[in-house]
């Protein structure tokens, strides 16, 4: 391995809120966690009441100071675009009707006429 490019991998202590200390190795250094295997309900089989009320209060106090969102600007009436859409639909329908009539008139004689390459059996 090259020297000087790898991070320092040192002994680390992970401190839990319950008081448990886990010794491991990391590049981070010492750090604190809220729940570990000693106090997590899955491992202990005991139910733990989380401090959700405190979290809600912190959220409310944090966002109470922010101003309310401004009302959205009023939009112009959408009557004209609706008329344009209707006109475009009518134009497409008229074009399809014309195209359908011309295709039918071309297709009918071709179906009645025998093919030049067809061999009688």
From Swiss-Prot:
A Pfam family (short name) is Ribosomal_L31
Q: Which domain of life is it from?
A: Bacteria
Bias kind Basic and acidic residues: ranges:
81-93
Cofactor(s) required for function per UniProt: Zn(2+)
Q: Does the keyword Ribonucleoprotein apply?
A: yes
Start and end residues of each stretch annotated as Large ribosomal subunit protein bL31: 1-97
Q: Where is this region: Disordered?
A: 65-121
Which example biological process does GO assign this protein? translation
Entry function: Binds the 23S rRNA.
Q: What is this protein called?
A: Large ribosomal subunit protein bL31
Q: Which organism's genome codes for this protein?
A: Anaeromyxobacter dehalogenans (strain 2CP-C)
Q: Which gene encodes it?
A: rpmE
